[in-house]
Amino acid sequence: RHYCHPNIHETLVDLLRIQLEIQAGTLAVADGTTCGSGPGPRTMTPVVKNLLFASTDQVAIDAVSAKLLGFDPMDVKCIRLADESELGHGHLDDIEVVGDMDTAEVKRTDWEFVVGDNAASAVGDLFWFGPLKPLSKIFFQTPIVNAFIMASFIYHDYIWYPTEGWGRVEKWLDETQWGRH
């Protein structure tokens, strides 16, 4: 998976293209009961939103989710590329939303979620997208990658989770309907 980080958006579009060739019309279900704001996927802050999304248009479900989170779907490269490749709909004007929310409400909604880096992803960004990119093949396509995997494991499981993460989980368990059941 480390090979894909520098081209993650293009990789996701390629995977969608393959999925549509193999099995078009697959129903996607996105669980928005508890969403995550902040650097992810392991260090997000849980936010209860109590929504479920379903669609046979994989791009549309991502576009609606992105908009609700507070992002312009067409600014998310994989959504834009998939829309331009006609693999699905990324423009909200081309998507009909029905259920507890309609398209107009989705367009008005902005949960103001944020993205960002934690210590582990900030180091990765230096190699995948930043000034150390010329060295990325040496570090991520050789056995040296195991040192990064171990460092991420130590950071997330032995530093971040005990000092920050467990408190977030306890709060979610104590204060939400999802934690009490």
Question: Could you describe each region identified by the protein language model?
Answer:
Residues 1-181:
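Extended, low-polarity segments enriched in aliphatic/aromatic residues
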